A protein has these predicted regions:
Chain A
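Short, solvent-exposed recognition segments
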Residues: 2-4, 132-206, 274
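N-terminal helix-turn-helix
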Residues: 2-94, 254-262
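Amphipathic alpha-helical regulatory segments at dimerization interfaces
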Residues: 27, 43, 94-106, 112, ...
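Amphipathic alpha-helical effector-binding/dimerization core
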Residues: 69-169
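Juxtadomain coupling helices with adjacent low-complexity linkers
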Residues: 195, 206, 223-274
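Sensor-regulatory modules in signal-transduction proteins
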Residues: 215-218
Length: 274, 274
DNA sequence: GCATGTGTTCGACTATATCGAACACTGTTT
DNA sequence: AAACAGTGTTCGATATAGTCGAACACATGC
């Protein structure tokens, strides 16, 4: 009955049923199609009755929906609302709105803001390139950290231990140019750390590049990154990084970092009701 | 504290701790700022230790984050990812992408697609008006059903019992023109049902109007709605609804409904691997 | 310095979640 | 037709696993 804690991590008390419920949610979210009770039970190693009870409870909360025809389950609408609520409460995102807008118009490129989540970068804000082209919204998407400039910018300023674990955790290639060797990646992170800016040249999507810089809080931790994405021809013309964009990104990240740091140091909880 | 199940639905067993965990998440999502353990415990009527255990478990799953400085809790990044996963699995949204795009360019207005969630309409897709103006993305937002055309369009075709409960559940005014009287609202729903299209004229935001039509699945249930939003001057010039937009919305909703119905009737699970 | 606040820990109690087998139902196979 | 292999669902016995409440350590403000 006892689930052994994997690789002898610190054994903190966790509530079993809630953990299982969370894993069900992630399971439904990961696989891109609806699952049945038996499939859920199998994949999590639970009794069918147990999985059913959990699903029923989640359904009552509208975190999960059941297709009335097939009886299978999928994520529910409350999930979207909570996801949105996360964004509303997100400090980095809130503070980045104005900076991202101005960076987008100044650089005439799309802007993304991301934070580290596991070994991926989670996009928390996205401003479209200011032209009429059709673009898809990427907020909520997650990108392997080593395949985007945002991720490298964050990783470069992480405490050693954390950076190590990132480097060691399965680096999968997305394009032919994705760097997956930990050693060379570590070197490039050192370069990023001295330059203060990270680059990505078709390592995630062929034809697209990114220039990004880290964002720090008042403790000096890299809590996220902001950068511009766009076609290689414009970001890296003739193999050289556009100096204009580079300066714009750097200055924006500094301004945003100042915002983040100042918010905590100067006044403790200015927005809270007294 | 107890939400009465609409029309006396059967009360089944639910797992206590999971339900409590879900309520914690909603609490963190609703109040727009981070909460402490004691506050959570108070608002849910739990022992402090219990609330702590739940929060710890949710934190381990990254559904909740703890501010290392203040010790207070907020929603975590996994929430955003799950919210996004909900969208990816959402059938109506998936099928509406193309229709919404074409409606937006045909009508030169912003397009929204929504579903009913509780007594609100949850926006699951949003196409910006095809001009260069700055617009904010509304996906994930929820709007009181009686204050938007999407909501009226859905409600007009709901089973009697469900429509009743909507009419009876606290209708709050958002602007001076919001209709909050159940009787007059019911009348207007009857009109909507015969016309096949719903209107909204500055009932949610001053200066903005909306034209929407319902979307049906193969069972004939109104599972959502699609419509255009924009300034009153363009949607309702001189007090008359733009005939062009009205036709466009109507035709789009019919096409989308056909998509939704056809997907289920013709082939059972065409997208599933064999 | 005390008084109040916080988040956190711990152990005893029993309410509570888990299991596993049996159920009703559907569509397919024989 | 009838037996089969699936599904989601129900139910009751068992002891596990979650809940409570008091005590803890730490921070803040009087």
């Amino acid at each position: 009955m006892s689930l052994a804690t994997p690789d002898g991590g610190p054994r903190r008390a966790t509530i079993q049923s809630v953990e299982r419920a969370a894993r069900i949610l992630k399971l439904l979210g990961a696989g891109s199609w609806r699952l049945g009770v038996t499939e859920v039970a199998e994949r999590l190693g639970l009794a069918k009755g147990t999985a059913y009870g959990l699903l029923r409870t989640l359904e009552a909360q509208e975190l999960v929906e059941q297709d009335p025809e097939t009886g299978k389950y999928r994520l529910g609408p409350a999930m979207l609302q909570l996801g949105n609520a996360f964004l509303d409460n997100h400090e980095l995102r809130a503070r980045s709105l104005l900076w991202a807008d101005s960076l987008a118009s100044r650089g005439a490129e799309a802007v993304r803001v991301g934070v580290l989540h596991g070994s991926n970068v989670l996009i928390v804000h996205h401003v479209f390139r200011p032209d009429n082209s059709v673009q898809i919204l990427e907020v909520g998407a997650s990108i392997p950290w080593h395949a985007c400039a945002l991720g490298k910018a964050i990783a470069a300023y992480l405490p050693d231990a954390q950076r190590r674990s990132l480097l060691d955790s399965g680096l999968v290639p997305l394009t032919g140019r994705t760097v997956t060797d930990p050693a060379t990646l570590e070197e490039s992170l050192a370069t990023v750390a001295t330059a203060g800016v990270a680059l990505e040249d078709q390592e995630a999507i062929v034809g697209e590049a990114e220039i990004a810089a880290p964002v720090f809080d008042d403790m000096g931790h890299s809590v996220g990154a902001i950068g511009v994405v766009g076609p290689v021809e414009r970001l890296v013309p003739d193999g050289r990084v556009s100096a204009t964009l580079l300066a714009a990104v750097r200055e924006t990240s500094r301004g945003l970092s100042r915002d983040m740091g100042a918010g905590r140091v100067r006044s403790r909880g200015p927005a809270a009701r007294p």
